[in-house]
Amino acid sequence: MKTKLLFLLGLCCLNISAQTINLQSFATGFSSPVEITCAPNDTRLFVVQQSGLIRILNPNGTINTTPFLTLTSSTILSGGERGLLGLAFHPNYATNGYFYVNYTRAGDGATVIARYSVSADPNIADASSGTVLLTVAQPFSNHNGGSIKFGPDGYLYIGMGDGGSGGDPGNRAQNINENLGKMLRIDVNSASPYGIPATNPYVGISGNDEIWAIGLRNPWKFSFNRLNGDLWIADVGQNAIEEINKVSTPATNTGLNFGWRCYEGNVPYDNSGCPSYSATYAPIAVYVHGTTNRCSITGGYFYTGSTYPNFANKYFFADYCTGEIGWVSSDGTITWNYNGPNLITTFGEDTNGELYVAMGGTIYKMIDASLSVNDFGNKGLQLYPNPVQNELVVKNDNNLLLISVTITDLTGKIVLTQGLDALADNRISVASLAKGIYLATVDGPNGRLFQTKLVKE
């Protein structure tokens, strides 16, 4: 009966669509990247390598030679699911220079949340500035969580796995006196080493004060929607179901129970002495392993950028084992769209809300493969000829205010930028470009108007 139920669950809310997601190589040369993030209002990306390095990836796709931060084997224990796993910049990083890391400690593998500071050089952190805020013992080597993020409430959220092994043998995720299997929330501003938000659910009563929610197995990746503050948590399943949780107004919507180990996704797992399913917080979407090779969710982001209108109102994620990328729509429907050759370890989001993924040692931009020259017509713009040999025309039928056109190659490198006459038709020489496929972007005073593929013959 359970097998039949899982099969039906896999059919009821999954779609396969013509591929619109594509990945464009942006930078390569990384080793085991596990996090991609940015500081507030900073155009650089910071790439976390599991072995202990944080490297700076510049907007033009170049990588700084000197790492931003290096944590050595005397500080971290790396390998398997352990290592340097998470990075978050303080909301006031531009003025206080604080950033926070999540790593497993050398020796015993305990989870450590520590604060560091940037040095006088904005490209290099002060490696001697480390201050440990929180330590959580880990009984096994797996299910260490990974992501740490500042929420819209200004508090630091910390995703904690259930302590590892399989099936949560200590039932730690449901134990409110343990920090494992939880989403923690701390205030890094009010006290040393940290304070407790007054609205955390167990303040003043039985239960650990740091807990914001219980019942998680291994929330490897979670993120906040920049537009409305919704919290999206991708929780890795045991052996049958992967789940995605969406929490609106997380600042006040506290004390939730996501269900593990009582329930795996929306199906009972080990529910002796457990609350009813209706008393737990149900996921917005699940997908089953079934007869596929899917096995482990890599959470991503709700798209908030402006480059790809087709990505709007979608939360993107991947399956680590198959390399597939999917999205969740507002009604909880999952659509699988991209089937890649490699294992996706993390997504990233830049300051403009555009998305990236890491596969192997390469960082890719996520782009809309369905963009075509016809899309320019939606804005009253025409870009022709396409394919082009020597001269490209940007025709402005609607008298839009134009600023510039930028052409990038498939590695994300800018190969041509030219200012445009604001309200006129424009001609751009592309004779010097090598033959191939490019992306052409037209910007106005408020940012990007549109982007399209361009073929140079």
Model-derived segments and their meaning:
Residues 1-21, 373:
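Bacterial Sec-dependent N-terminal signal peptides
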Residues 82-84, 92-94, 162-334, 356, ...:
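Beta-propeller domain segments
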Residues 375-384, 388-457:
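C-terminal outer-membrane/trafficking sorting elements
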Residues 118, 186-188, 247-248, 365-371, ...:
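Short beta-strand-to-coil "C-cap" segments at the C-terminal boundary of structured domains/repeats
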Residues 345-370:
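Blade-level signature of beta-propeller repeat domains, shared across WD40, Kelch, NHL, RCC1
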Residues 132-135, 337, 417, 451:
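Residue-level detector of high-confidence beta-strand sites
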Residues 19-167, 221-224, 229-237, 241, ...:
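Acidic, Gly/Ser/Thr-rich repeat motifs that build Ca2+-stabilized beta-propeller blades
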Residues 64-66, 333-337, 413-419:
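Surface-exposed loop/edge segments in extracytoplasmic proteins
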